[in-house]
Amino acid sequence: MSKKYGEKGLPKGTLKLNFTGAAGQSFGAFATKGLEMKIEGNTNDYFGKGLSGATLIVKVPKKSTFKSHENIITGNVALYGATSGEAYINGIAGERFCVRNSGATAVVEGVGDHGCEYMTGGIALILGKIGRNFAAGMSGGIAYIFKSNNEFRSDNFNMEMIEFEKLDKQDYDIIKDLLEKHYSYTQSSICLLYTSDAADDLWC
């Protein structure tokens, strides 16, 4: 696709690929504009590595009985070096989520240690808990985190290069849009817990 259509790529969702089961490493790596890749199951490490404009969705199987936001669904180093595109993750991601992300947008229901490490751009909306050392070396981009899920402890956030800001209407509009998309793609029940009434529960 990149060879034929170049940097411009194809319109969003031109080619939709659906998978089931357990994917190996690097599912959706370097996926380009126009692709939509959806897997009902789980993925391993390096999910969305170098994402370059595609939309990636990983969701729990329809017949699953467990709570998605309490279980890991993708491995470590998801979205490593992503430059653009979107990812909707119906569960918890492992360590180093969005490391070196420079432009992709991601919604996830929890992350392990070192989340958003060295992130320089893009958006991460985290609907669950974060691990230790969040935002180490993060020099750009935005992470939205719900306070009710996370204690403000010295080992939770690496404050060397980040600051918290008061959210404005634009932020709330972004969050609302991402929640609607996440629900549309994954039917995650956790989205129903976060309405506009929960706006004061956010850290930015």
Residue locations for each model-derived region?
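Conserved small/polar residues in nucleotide/adenosyl-binding loops
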Residues: 194-199
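Terminal amphipathic helices with adjacent charged low-complexity linkers/tails
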Residues: 147-167
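N-terminal leader/propeptide and maturation segments of large enzyme subunits in energy/redox metabolism
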Residues: 166-171, 175-193
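Detector for repetitive beta-architecture
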Residues: 14-16, 34-36, 53-55, 84-86, ...
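Feature marks extracellular polysaccharide-active and adherence modules
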Residues: 20, 30, 38-42, 50, ...
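Acidic/polar low-complexity surface segments
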Residues: 54-78
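Short, T/G/N/S-enriched strand-turn elements that build extracellular solenoid repeat scaffolds
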Residues: 2-8, 25-31, 43-51, 76-79, ...
